[in-house]
Amino acid sequence: MALALLRRGASPTDAQRRGRRRRWPIVVAVLAGVVTLAACATFETVDYYWQGAAGQIELLANSQPIPDVIGKSDAALAARLKRIHEIREFASRELGLPNNGSYTRYTDLGRAYVTWNVFATPELSLKPRQWCFPIAGCVNYRGYFREAQAAGESKRLKAAGDDVYVGGVPAYSTLGWFDDPVLSSFVSWPETEIARLIFHELAHQLIYVKSDSAFNESYATTVEEAGLARWLASRHDSQLDKLAARADHMRSVFRDLVRTTRTKLSEIYASNASDDDKRRAKHDIVAAMKAAYESAKQGDPALSGYDRWFAQQPNNAALAAVGLYTDRVPAFRELLHEANDDLPTFYRRVRELAARPKRQRDAALDALAQRAAASAMTAQRSGTRTN
């Protein structure tokens, strides 16, 4: 995930990266300038810009070089940071991801998440609201460095009649404009999940399309999947393989539940039924999803990892947030498959897609998804497996 307030329409050039550390003394002035540019906007908008700028400054100011942290940490944290260093080097060396200062420093947040993202949809629609910014373009969420501020925005949107979902974010990407640090919010995760996260966030630094969250997140999710497969192959650790397979299974069960629910809701919302009938159907469909989840947990208690998501009472906004990360993944997987699993070729073709107008880009992704579905059906019939 990329932070809306700080990202640009493209990643910085090599020359810009080399100048980053020289620019650090004026980072505060630069970010304050963002707030100044918003002076003609509403107080609410200015306040939003300010909390983002202040949060980023605090995050970077409190970071420390990982070697320094290792030297004064307990054995468990030191071991984790050393492993993260290996993952970071692997990302650039083997996956062709940016080689810069990101994930070479560590920040202890003192809280569970670095930001909280607020997603919203109309009551009877799965189309997420968008918020547009002069620098960042349009995104499908608003990010806050303080949970109370996210809760306040959630309350405001709910009062306007929207479905709202607030999700804690363990990490985000500034697309290479700053050296994104390793955060305490994810440092204790399993190795496989840390690898996924780092590969995902670095993928955002490599390619980013302004105002197309679904493209950006699905592309980065595909990179994290491909990266993890290569990381596991390099580790030769059967326990890690089992851990990754287990996590993949849980994701698959969860995503299938969400996909099925979204399909049913989409059909209802597109129908000629009255709004009251749509509301009743929505209630029943979401209740059925929750019941299916509880049933699945009885057969596999490990699925309880998604309890937090279900505890918020799933709604359109929660379902839409999941979709941003998964809807286009089959298309990008197919693109990687057609590139013979060669990442440089894949990146080149993703850039070609990114350069197209959105309508053409979406049409190309639809065609890729159709080819992926056809290949999967053929493989199923023949008893083989693709991708």
Regions flagged by a language model, labelled:
Residues 59-73, 131-139, 311-313, 330:
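Acidic/histidine-rich, surface-exposed loop or edge segments in extracytoplasmic proteins
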Residues 256-387:
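Pan-zinc metallopeptidase signature
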Residues 28-37:
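Bacterial N-terminal signal peptides
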Residues 86-251:
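Acidic/His-rich structured neighborhood in mature extracellular/periplasmic domains
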